[in-house]
Amino acid sequence: MLQIYNTLSKTKEVFTPLVGNQVRMYVCGMTVYDYCHLGHGRSMVAFDVITRWLRHRGYDLTYVRNITDIDDKIINRANENGEPFDVLTERMIAAMHEDEARLNILKPDQEPRATDHIAGMHAMIQTLIDKGYAYAPGNGDVYYRVGKFAGYGKLSRRRVEDLRIGARIEPGEAKEDPLDFVLWKGAKPGEPSWSSPWGEGRPGWHIECSVMSTCCLGDSFDIHGGGNDLEFPHHENEIAQSEAATGKPYAKSWLHCGMITINGEKMSKSLGNFFTIREVLEKYHPEVVRYLLIASHYRSPINYSEENLREAKAALDRFYNALKGLPEAAPAEAAEYVERFAAAMDDDFNTAGACSVLFELAREVNRLRESDLSAAAALAARLKQLAGLLGVLQLEPEAFLQAGAEGKVDAAEVEALIQARLEARAAKNWAESDRIRDQLTAMGVVLEDGKGGTTWRLAD
């Protein structure tokens, strides 16, 4: 029985789809003005694992993740670069897809872009105006009337009265209330804009997601996800817009993943304390980065550090060493391990608990390989199958172990040195053999001489 923590109710609930076996999930995606940082990677990987598990459980899942391709940050960066905004966004979208592929992230079923849904935004805004939830003061802007929506604050547990304390209307804004937020922004000189019933302009951020989600999944759907920094105001405002416009409940369950932190602060571009996925992948194998992101529960924060990445590498080394050198085999039944793995994942997608089951499996594989190679191989196949549900341990063990965490060793150079050492040993040139071994050790390479020849791996 799958249970998920619903931010809306602040409780763990038994998951029941709205319609039969169908699950419709929308996740807030990237604002594509720069390369993805590791915090974005955390959200991508978290909902990738959730997607894999829902499908494994037999649900008919439709996964939608949007792209915000018009925004103040995009306009500012394009102006800084001296390029059209859509040239910038196309380049960043391509880079995002490359990062995802390297982290073994499955593609969403749909990936709508905000600029493809302008007409839908006009329609929802007009509906909100007609119902009295929005107003156009005549300056080209359109605002949402927060005080009219009785349920405002129900996701984030904020009270409108408390939010008004200290709130103020900025110069140039034509709001009725400091809490009102923009649905449509009147055009400014030199900015991209679209025609609308209220004049040239562009959409506000919040209306984009309300329109894209309901367009792709319907007025009501099962799961809405994103980083926990989006809970307020973005997701709160989405609920206010969508439920006022449709008169129906918006998303049944809200899932929020924790942040990547550095020294206790959220990793973010605005704070300048971020590492792009690309920068991290220059030093660490993609699977090391992915494992770091799944080793903790998706709602927990992850502290970014070199030490934590090295620990992730060491964990994967243990797994791949358990899988190494075993023949192909059908997966063992391993009912107890399978049931405990499933119990962890059914408990709000508890990947940390699932990984602990994988470690127990790896220990048992290592124990069995000394006495029953076929049983070890079958259990290893089950280990690989379960790990695949988390998107890890699908490489050839030797390939991963030789690639290492940092990828700075040239495999061809290592193989050439090993061959030279074998030739030195055959010629009984022990001094040369030892010199080559010392050279390899200095490179971080560990040699393992066995009956089948010499294999190598990188030191932990």
Swiss-Prot record:
Keyword Cell wall biogenesis/degradation recorded: no
InterPro entries hit by this protein: Cys-tRNA-ligase (IPR015803), Cys-tRNA-synt_Ia_DALR (IPR015273), Cys-tRNA/MSH_ligase (IPR024909), CysS_C (IPR056411), Rossmann-like_a/b/a_fold (IPR014729), tRNA-synt_1_cat_dom (IPR032678), tRNAsynth_Ia_anticodon-bd (IPR009080)
Span(s) of short sequence motif 'KMSKS' region: 266-270
Catalytic function, reaction form: tRNA(Cys) + L-cysteine + ATP = L-cysteinyl-tRNA(Cys) + AMP + diphosphate
SUPFAM superfamilies: Anticodon-binding domain of a subclass of class I aminoacyl-tRNA synthetases (SSF47323), Nucleotidylyl transferase (SSF52374)
EC nos: 6.1.1.16
Motif residue range(s): 'HIGH' region: 30-40
Cofactor note: Binds 1 zinc ion per subunit.
GO cellular component term, pick one: cytoplasm
Cofactor: Zn(2+)
Keywords: Aminoacyl-tRNA synthetase, ATP-binding, Cytoplasm, Ligase, Metal-binding, Nucleotide-binding, Protein biosynthesis, Zinc
GO molecular function, one term: zinc ion binding
Residues annotated to bind Zn(2+): 28, 209, 234, 238
Class of the enzyme per the UniProt entry, highest EC level: ligase
Family membership: Belongs to the class-I aminoacyl-tRNA synthetase family.
HAMAP family cross-referenced by the UniProt entry: Cys_tRNA_synth
Assembly and oligomerization: Monomer.
The protein's name: Cysteine--tRNA ligase
